Structure formats: structure tokens, C-alpha cells
């Protein structure tokens, strides 16, 4: 007998429900009924969520995207599809909640009071479950094709007896709370809803998700995926990556990487989890996080096939199903050390991406139509999901061509890649701005914020490089004003998110983009009225094993690591994960007189200059000074200052997205690390 909850029938009255609850209290091992659960959810949390579709009927094949958009008759809430789970060769069921009484009791002790649960449920009752189902559960492609049966979602008033199922409810409830505005005041609560959210998530993660014994079921794997999405929407990309790595290992132990040879167990026989869809989600999510962070993937040889994923996926715009291997191929290209081989791979992947565009109907690429839609409506979800497919596609174009933006070895490819990156970045920013303008409160779509950061940096660097061209060689001159306005609007969205969520990451994103905007303003603005050169904002990036890039109004230059220069300390904003980015501003220069640095030799770390890292006012921790070693305009973070891999948001700062970006930008594809004789072609000087 399963310990999982069974979905109540739609016509079950309150009396029957109360009787069922009393029966459960009397005997937890007996079958029980649960009231219709509140529907909770969010907008799509990631641009790579897996959306599978059933085989289309003859009638559905005649429909195009525009005709299949939700209408006013479309159900507003997602319903459970009637497809059975994928057949497995070895599948068991666990029905022993009594084996973990201490864990269950510990989880229940972390639940908020019943009054708080009731109040929070009433505030979450209008939100949809779309992102939860579209992320890793088998669901129909369009609301009109779904049944009327509602999906039961976490109602902590009727807590589970098995710790895995109870942890699932706690994580789902936390995800729902995550999409309430942090500034929203909910009367009647004993604690702020964000504190309740953090306690629910932390307890489920520490007591269940970190216990390997409880990860041998599909439901345990589901909890890891939920945890990863929770970290993504919380802005902690590194912890999401670590969690997804654990999900990869767990899924492999359950045999999900071998269709037809599964060996997993389930806690609840009535669950609708599909192992093939879960594996596809895990692989695509892990690979995309690796691409953004500049880390190697653990699923390079993995493949997945979605059952019932037919040509209907093309109509619905299910991009991860159509091009599941592109992310992996880009990561492999980035790790190639033969320039010609890397160039051939780049051109082949580019051709593959262009082929994907031809598969989709023209209506799929029409401008977004979010105006006038309700935030939690089905129409808004499908439109946002389409925007996510766009962002995902253009982010792949960006990542593919970044290595050739600065590379002097391939002139023709450099021009093509620079235009491709600028165009893709522009499209990403436009769509992310539309999403944030439509719903500026929710913590969802956080992955889009990170992708938009990379897009904004790329677009500004493309214009800075264009200033180094003369006359008609500046191919972006007519787009400059519009692109600057787009980046500035993206900044406003980032600052709004930072203020609402006390988010250090978005605050750092805004600070960096502001400096790039100021640098891009041009050499003419760098001089004062009397003709004297004014102080500049200078962006200096050190990338491990590659070199240091200096971006200023007078151009871009790269310094190899083995260049010996006088060691000077500078105050400024230091950010970074594996390396560091240092922004030196005129205001910092004014303060340098009071902070003279000691000269540091490679063997003398005792005399390192100490600077205070600048933090936004929203930071919730008191930061200690960070010791730095500097060489000219090169700034490093000593090894002991790096936080643990699972550290919180404050410790990780930029999460490594910054240095991963510049690592690819500077090193190129298939190129060897720079040395003192290789930098001449990499220096760009502004044209007068």
C-alpha cells in the first residue's frame, strides 16, 4: 500500500474530507483522502525546462502556433495529463514510513503553525502550477488538451508520513512562497513569510536531500530537482549546479540514463513522474549551468529521448527537445585546444542552430504579446514560455560566438561573430525586459537575469570594439543609441529586483553594467572642458591561466600573467568567483591618498595590501576585508579568500558568471594561453 496521498475527486464534499482526515489520524497506514489541494506555482524558472507533448491528432496537425494559443475558454490552471509513466524493467514501491520516524518528526517540528499555513494558502491560491509541471513532469503542450483533473500541491495542514513526501511538500510550499514579493506585508502571520520559506526549504534540504539513504526513489530525485530550481530562483547558481550534479549521480544510480533498464523505486504508486522526462530535464539543466559558469559537464556522453515527443514539439516551440545536444557541443568546443578544429566545430554548430530556426513556424517568432494578460493566467504562461525558448536560443548563439569577438586570428569570423553576438544580446535583453516589466515582483525567471547580464556585457563590449574601427567599418554605429537605451532599461529591472529581494548578485550586475555604459560613452566624453583628460572608469578582469583584460575609454588591452610590473594597490569594487573583476572609479582615486599600498613580491604575501570590498546596502552580512595581490592593473584574490562551494549568495557574489564570460572571450576557441609575445593583435585602440 502506498503512503502517498491520493487525489480527491472533484465532487467530494467537506464532510467526506473531514472524515478522511480523522481516519488518517486514527490509522496512518490506511487509505486516506485529502481535500482538493491549493494550486501553487510560478512562472517558468529556467529557459531550459522540458515540455513534452503527446502525438498530435490529425486535427491538431492542421493547427499552427497562432491558432493554438490559449483562448478565453482555456482553463486557467494546469491539469494532470492521463499518460501513464514510462514502462520500466525494474520498479518497486516503498511503504515503510515507520522506518524514518525521527526524520519525519524533525520535519514536522519545522512546519509553521496551522494558522500561518492557512493564511499563506489563501495568499497562494491564485497562483498557477505551470512551471512545476512544465519543468520535469509529463504534461500536455497546451491547456486546451488537458483534462479537468487538478494537480494536488503541498497542503501542509495534512502532512505526509513518509519523510521524502513531506520534504517534497515543504519544498513546493517554499517555492510558492518564493514568488511572493519580499516586501509584501501579510497580516496575521507569526513570522515573515520569507523566514517561513527559508525554514521550510532548509529543513527539507538538510534532513532529507542530504541523506543519501532517502535518494533511492523517483520522489527523492524529484526533491533534488526542486531544490535546484529553488536555488536558481533564489539567485544562487552555484548551489543549483552542485545540487543538479547530485541529481545526475542519483539518476544514474536509478538507471534513468538507460531507457528500458530502469531500477528505481517509488514511494507513491500513484505519482505521475516520468523517468525519461526527469532525466532529460536533469541533463539539459546541468549542461546549461555548466555553460554559464564555465565548468565541465558530467553528462557529455548522455543522451535522452522523450517518449511521445513528436513533431508537435515543433509547433509548441519545445527547444530543448529539438536541440538537446547543442549545449554539450558548445562546451566541448570550448575545451578544444586546436584552433582549426574549434573553428570547424563552431561553424557546424552555427549551421545546426540555423536549421532549428527553419523548423519552427514564422508565428513562433512574432513579438511578445504580454500586454493585457493576467500575471497568473494560462495565456501569460504560454507566452512567457515562448519568450524563454527565444532567450535560450539566443543565449546559445551568444555562447557559441563569444570566443571570436576579440580573436585576431580569424578576421572574417571575428566580424561575423561580433554581429551575431550583438544581435543575439539585443534580442535577449528585449525579451527579459518584457518579462520583468510584465511581472516585476516574482523571483521566477532568475536564469533570465543571469543570461541578460551576459547579454548586456556582450553588447557593450561589441560597441566598445566598434569604436576602434574607422569610418564605414563600424557596423554597429546606427544601433548604438538604441542599444544603450536597452541596456539602461535592463539596469532598471535589475535594480528593482535588487531592492525587492536584497539581492547582491543583481546589485553587482547593475554596478558592472553601469561602468561598461560609462566606458562605452566614448573618448570624447573622457575629456573635460579645458581639454585635460578626466579620470576614467577602468574595468580590469583577470582570468586564470589566460591573462588580464583592461577595458577603458581609450580602448581594450590584454596583459599576460608573466609580465612583471610594479605592484600597486587600488580600491574599487572587486567581484568574481574563480577570478576577479576590479572597477576603478574616480571616487576611488580620490580616496587612494589615504591608503598607500606596500610593494608585494611573489614570495612575500605578508605585505599584501588590504582593501575593503564594496558591498551594496542590501547586503545582509558584515563583510571582512579581502586581501589582494595586485600587479599593475591585474588584481587577484588569494586562495584562502575563496568561499566553500556550497556557500550562500553573499559569499559567492558574482557566482563565477563574470569570469566564465571573460575566460571564453579572451582565450578564444582552441587557442593557447597568452604570453608576453602574443598580445599585440589583441589590443584595440579607440579611433579619434
UniProtKB/Swiss-Prot annotation:
Disulfide bonds: none annotated. Keywords: Nucleus, Transcription, Transcription regulation. Coiled coil: none annotated. CDD domains: fungal_TF_MHR. Residues 1-16 have a biased composition (Acidic residues). GO terms for molecular function: DNA binding; zinc ion binding. It comes from the Eukaryota. Residues 1-95 are annotated as: Disordered. InterPro entries: Transcription_factor_dom_fun. Griseofulvin is a spirocyclic fungal natural product used in treatment of fungal dermatophytes. Probable transcription factor that regulates expression of the gene cluster that mediates the biosynthesis of Griseofulvin, an important antifungal drug that has been in use for a long time for treating dermatophyte infections. It is found in: Nucleus. Residues 58-75 have a biased composition (Basic and acidic residues). Residues 24-36 have a biased composition (Polar residues). One of its GO terms (biological process) is DNA-templated transcription. It comes from Penicillium aethiopicum. The keyword Membrane does not apply. This is Probable transcription factor gsfR1. GO terms for cellular component: nucleus.
Amino acid at each position: 500500500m502506498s503512503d502517498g496521498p491520493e487525489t480527491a475527486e472533484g465532487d467530494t464534499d467537506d464532510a467526506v474530507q473531514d472524515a478522511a482526515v480523522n481516519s488518517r489520524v486514527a490509522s496512518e497506514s490506511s487509505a486516506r483522502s485529502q481535500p482538493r489541494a491549493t494550486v501553487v506555482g510560478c512562472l517558468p524558472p529556467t529557459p531550459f525546462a522540458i515540455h513534452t507533448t503527446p502525438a498530435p491528432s490529425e486535427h491538431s496537425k492542421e493547427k499552427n502556433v497562432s491558432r493554438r494559443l490559449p483562448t478565453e475558454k482555456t482553463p486557467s490552471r494546469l491539469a494532470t495529463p492521463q499518460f501513464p509513466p514510462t514502462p520500466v524493467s525494474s520498479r518497486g514501491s516503498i511503504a515503510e514510513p515507520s522506518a524514518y520516524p525521527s526524520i519525519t518528526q524533525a520535519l514536522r517540528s519545522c512546519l509553521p503553525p496551522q494558522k500561518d499555513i492557512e493564511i499563506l494558502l489563501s495568499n497562494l491560491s491564485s497562483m498557477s502550477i505551470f512551471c512545476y509541471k512544465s519543468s520535469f513532469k509529463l504534461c500536455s503542450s497546451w491547456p486546451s488538451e488537458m483534462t479537468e483533473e487538478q494537480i494536488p500541491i503541498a497542503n501542509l495542514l495534512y502532512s505526509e508520513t513518509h519523510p521524502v513526501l513531506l520534504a517534497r511538500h515543504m519544498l513546493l510550499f517554499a517555492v510558492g512562497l518564493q514568488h511572493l514579493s519580499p516586501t509584501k506585508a501579510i497580516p496575521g502571520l507569526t513570522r515573515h513569510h520569507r523566514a517561513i520559506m527559508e525554514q521550510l526549504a532548509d529543513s527539507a534540504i538538510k534532513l532529507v536531500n542530504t541523506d543519501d539513504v532517502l535518494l533511492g526513489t523517483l520522489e527523492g530525485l524529484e526533491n533534488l530537482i526542486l531544490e535546484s530550481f529553488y536555488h536558481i530562483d533564489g539567485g544562487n547558481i552555484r548551489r543549483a549546479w552542485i545540487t543538479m550534479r547530485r541529481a545526475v549521480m542519483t539518476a544514474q544510480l536509478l538507471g534513468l540514463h538507460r531507457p528500458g533498464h530502469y531500477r528505481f523505486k517509488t514511494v507513491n504508486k500513484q505519482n505521475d513522474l516520468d523517468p525519461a522526462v526527469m532525466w532529460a530535464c536533469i541533463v539539459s539543466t546541468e549542461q546549461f549551468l555548466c555553460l554559464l559558469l564555465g565548468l565541465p559537464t558530467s553528462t557529455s556522453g548522455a543522451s535522452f529521448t522523450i517518449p511521445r515527443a513528436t513533431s508537435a514539439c515543433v509547433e509548441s516551440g519545445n527547444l530543448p527537445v529539438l536541440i538537446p545536444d547543442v549545449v554539450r557541443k558548445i562546451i566541448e568546443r570550448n575545451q578544444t585546444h586546436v584552433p582549426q578544429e574549434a573553428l570547424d566545430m563552431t561553424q557546424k554548430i552555427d549551421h545546426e542552430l540555423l536549421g532549428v530556426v527553419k523548423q519552427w513556424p514564422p508565428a513562433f517568432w512574432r513579438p511578445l504579446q504580454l500586454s493585457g494578460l493576467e500575471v497568473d493566467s494560462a495565456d501569460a504562461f504560454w507566452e512567457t514560455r515562448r519568450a524563454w525558448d527565444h532567450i535560450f536560443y539566443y543565449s546559445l548563439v551568444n555562447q557559441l560566438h563569444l570566443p571570436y569577438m576579440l580573436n585576431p586570428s580569424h578576421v572574417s569570423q571575428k566580424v561575423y561573430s561580433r554581429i551575431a553576438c550583438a544581435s543575439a544580446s539585443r534580442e535577449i535583453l528585449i525579451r527579459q525586459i518584457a518579462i520583468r516589466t510584465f511581472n516585476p515582483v516574482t523571483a521566477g525567471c532568475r536564469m533570465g537575469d543571469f543570461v541578460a547580464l551576459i547579454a548586456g556585457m556582450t553588447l557593450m563590449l561589441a560597441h566598445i570594439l566598434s569604436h576602434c574601427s574607422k569610418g564605414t567599418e563600424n557596423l554597429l554605429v546606427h544601433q548604438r543609441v538604441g542599444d544603450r537605451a536597452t541596456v539602461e532599461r535592463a539596469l532598471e529591472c535589475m535594480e528593482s529586483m535588487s531592492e525587492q529581494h536584497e539581492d547582491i548578485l543583481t546589485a553587482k550586475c547593475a554596478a558592472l553594467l553601469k561602468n561598461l555604459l560609462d566606458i562605452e560613452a566614448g573618448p570624447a566624453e573622457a575629456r573635460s572642458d579645458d581639454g585635460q583628460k578626466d579620470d576614467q572608469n577602468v574595468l580590469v578582469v583577470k582570468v586564470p591561466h589566460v591573462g588580464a583584460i583592461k577595458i577603458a575609454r581609450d580602448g581594450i588591452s590584454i596583459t599576460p600573467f608573466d609580465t612583471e610590473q610594479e605592484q600597486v594597490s587600488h580600491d574599487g569594487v572587486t567581484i568574481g568567483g574563480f577570478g576577479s573583476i576590479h572597477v576603478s572609479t574616480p571616487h576611488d582615486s580620490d580616496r587612494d591618498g589615504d591608503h598607500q599600498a606596500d610593494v608585494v613580491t611573489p614570495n612575500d604575501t605578508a605585505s599584501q595590501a588590504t582593501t575593503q570590498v564594496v558591498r551594496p546596502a542590501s547586503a545582509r552580512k558584515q563583510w571582512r576585508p579581502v586581501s589582494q595581490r595586485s600587479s599593475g592593473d591585474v588584481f587577484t584574490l588569494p586562495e584562502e579568500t575563496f568561499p566553500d562551494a556550497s556557500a550562500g549568495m553573499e559569499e559567492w557574489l558574482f557566482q563565477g558568471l563574470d569570469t566564465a564570460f571573460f575566460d571564453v572571450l579572451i582565450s578564444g576557441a582552441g587557442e593557447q594561453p597568452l604570453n608576453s609575445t602574443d598580445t599585440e593583435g589583441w589590443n584595440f585602440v579607440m579611433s579619434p
